[in-house]
Structure formats: C-alpha cells, structure tokens
Curated annotation (Swiss-Prot):
Key word Membrane present: yes
Gene for this chain: AIM36
Residues spanning the membrane: 57-76
GO cellular component: mitochondrial membrane
Transit peptide location: 1-27
Protein name: Altered inheritance of mitochondria protein 36, mitochondrial
Length: 293
C-alpha cells in the first residue's frame, strides 16, 4: 500500500521541501523520512520573531514642536520689520504711534501740585486778534505776578511742517499730501511738545498763565489735553465771534463740535462766556469777569 501512495505523495513532498528549504533551511537539511521524532516536533514549534517597528519617543516630538514655534516666531518678526512705516492714523493707531516713538508720557506733563504755578485757559474759537489780546490783558491784570503766554496751535503746526527735524514733520507732510484730516490727539500732542519746551527754558521758571487760541475744537482734544498735559482752568467763550463769525468760517459739523466743547466745560463748571466786544468795558463789568475767571 505504501508503494502505491509513494508516487502520489512525491510531488507534495517535493513542494513542501522547497518551502521548508526557503523558510527554514536548518530544518530541512535532513529528509523528512530520516528525521527523528524530536526533530519533527522541534520543527513544528519553531517561533519566528518579527522585527518591531521603533516608535518615536514623545520628547523628540516635543522638541520638534518647540523648534517649529521658535522658527515661526522669528519669521513673523522679520516680516513685521519689513512693513513700511504707516503715516496715516486712526485715533487708536496714533496712540500706538506715540507709545512706540516715545512721544507719549504715562503721567500728566503738569502734575497736580504744579497747577497753581502753571494755569491753562482755552478759547475754542476767536476770529479777531484784537479780542484775543484783550483777554490776555484781563489775565495779566488778574495775576500781575504771572506772565501770560499765548499759544497758537496753527502756528505750531506750520513750524512742524517747515522743520524736518521736528517730531511730527513727516506725519503732517504725509497727511497733507494725501488730503487726510489730522487724527484726533495730534494737535494736542504738538501743543504738549511746545509746553514741554517752554518748561525746560528760563521762561518756564516763572509762574505762567497759558492762553491757547482756537483750541480745543472737539471734546476729544479737550479730554486728551486734561489727561496728558494739565487741567484746564477755564474755557472762555467769545459770544460775538461764536454768534457771528463762526458760521461764516466753519462747516455745520465743525460748528457743532466747537459748541459741544462749550457744553462739555459748562457741565463741569469751567466755561465762561465773554459778551462784550466793541463797547468799552466799564470797571464794574471787568471786575465781574475777573472774579469769575
């Protein structure tokens, strides 16, 4: 019977031998018919260990992540440095410009305990230069020991435009070329620079009453002045100019803004209306004004 099956099994045995020879050469060196039972059992229980894939260590991933963040940070900074300087500003952007360039101080320029030495009076709108001088004379008569210093913001702006060494020269030049309005706070910043210069000269050693012409013309400028420079002693309203000259020289929007300044200071008891213009002031009226200023 075995002799009959041998021819049939011979192809299968040869095929098995090839597979075993390929996969387990050490186990098929001896023909299957000549192997001992121990060799056959050993062949069936051979365990092949597959190579394990090495998984990345967590700390290496962490290092790579940190390195990526650092690279992004430096690239972003280099891009920001290449951005051209911006010269047209909103109010918030102008505040940032002041902080970046060191033009903005954290505290008021005139501290509270210096308010008696330096006093500030503002006239939101004056058309007649002669009337401005009359108000200056009233202030001088009120306090003969103090000097009166008239500040004209329009004149300061022109000085900034003419001198390339001034801090706001290029900003003002750019805004004028583009036909854009001055951002809120710019005029106050120019006034602040002028007052700072005065305080650091011999003139600043004396008691001084500052009279600021045609300023503030918006409530934002008024608030910024009191936040950055000093308290305003009195807002002087020239009744005749406000009633007759203002409509001739300002738009409706500008007129409303200037009148709102009067309302702002009236709400805190700092507004005074001067009603005399052409008629000579008698002694009684002058005394009333001096008591109230």
């Amino acid at each position: 019977m075995f002799t009959r099956l041998a021819p049939r099994l011979q192809p299968q045995l040869l095929s098995t031998k090839r597979v075993l020879t390929t996969r387990y050469p050490t186990l098929v060196r001896t023909p299957i018919f000549h192997q001992t039972p121990i060799q056959i059992i050993k062949r069936n229980y051979v365990i092949v260990h597959k190579e394990r894939k090495k998984e990345p260590v967590i700390r290496y991933l962490f290092y790579m992540l940190v390195a990526s963040w650092v690279a992004i940070y430096f690239v972003a900074n280099r891009v920001d440095k290449k951005k051209p300087p911006k010269q047209s500003f909103t109010e918030r952007e102008f505040q940032s410009y002041e902080e970046e360039t060191g033009l903005k101080r954290r505290n008021k320029l005139i501290s509270h305990h210096m308010n008696s030495k330096y006093k500030f009076y503002v006239i939101p709108y004056v058309h007649d230069e002669e009337e401005l001088n009359r108000v200056a004379n009233l202030l001088q008569h009120k306090d003969e020991n103090a000097t009166v210093k008239i500040i004209d913001p329009a004149q300061l702006i022109e000085e900034q435009k003419k001198d390339e060494g001034m801090k706001y020269h290029y900003l003002l030049e750019d805004l004028d070329e583009q036909g854009k309005p001055y951002p809120p706070g710019l005029i106050t910043a120019v006034i602040k620079q002028e007052i700072y210069k005065i305080l650091n000269t011999r003139e600043g050693t004396f008691d001084t009453n500052f009279l600021i012409k045609n300023y503030p013309q918006t409530t934002n400028e008024a608030i910024k002045f009191e936040n950055d420079i000093s308290d305003i002693q009195k807002c002087l309203i020239l009744h005749y100019d406000m009633l007759n000259e203002l409509p001739k020289n300002k738009t409706d929007e500008e007129q409303r803004a200037i009148k709102n300044v009067d309302g702002y200071f009236s709400s805190v008891g700092k507004s005074k209306t001067l009603v005399e213009k052409f008629d000579p002031m008698d002694k009684e009226f002058e005394d009333i004004i001096l008591e109230d200023i």
